[in-house]
Amino acid sequence: MSSLGNLANTGLVNYISFCFLFFVLKFRYYPENGLTWMVAFVVLSFVIQLIINIYLTSLPELCGQADFNIAIYATIVPWMAIFVLFSVSLSIFPGWLRLFSNTFGSSAAYMYGLKETMDKIFTVENRTDAERDQTNFQLLKALDSLYSDRDTLIQELDISDVFFNEKGEIVWKSFTGTLKMLLLTAEIEQSTLKDLYYCILLKDNVAFFVWFMLIGILSVLVSTNTLMNEGCSTKKGGAFDIIFNRT
């Protein structure tokens, strides 16, 4: 049993390693959100788990030789019932990302330089100019609250309308509107806007990573459990038949 337990850990270790490497490379080369990378992740993780399951069936503790039928079955069922269903749900309900993007994601973004980027936007000079001619006390109080608690603003930023023009300049209309609402009319440098955009993308990428790591671990456990309990189609009996005296 202990040896079979060690074999079960093989899938978990490989999946977690793949998941971490995938998201590191994703943020490096394709940080934007979308469906393309999600489909690629599901397909690649399925192929890797299938290869691992085929390998596990070839071991003496299970079938003694590669059993493609049970390996495919043990991989398709959890990936279709859990992985694909969750991926579709996450696309339909993007608000689920907030659970981790505003916790783990925010921590990663601050380590990436989010605080320094926000400091460049909310400069003392910019704030002074914005408030100089204002006499509305309630407005100034609200602005002071936003200036001192930037996390709330960061959590509400929308990046769905971001695009880069033919000059490579970032165009972010919703954020520009937010700055005007905050009476910050000074022009923000392109490099600062891009840094902020990638900080927000990092928040989302970390959230996707945590979600897919958790749902992937569940899928791998279900897959491995199915593999070891279904029996082999290439030979009668197996390790679990002997252990539980099944005939």
Where are these regions (language model features)?
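Membrane-proximal, non-transmembrane alpha-helical segments
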Residues: T152-M213, V220-L221, M228-F240
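Charge-rich cytosolic interhelical loops and cytosolic tails of multi-pass membrane proteins
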Residues: A81-Q190
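N-terminal first transmembrane alpha-helix
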Residues: M1-A109, C199-G216, S223-G237, D241
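Compact beta-rich and alpha/beta scaffold cores in large eukaryotic transport/transcription complexes
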Residues: N245-T247
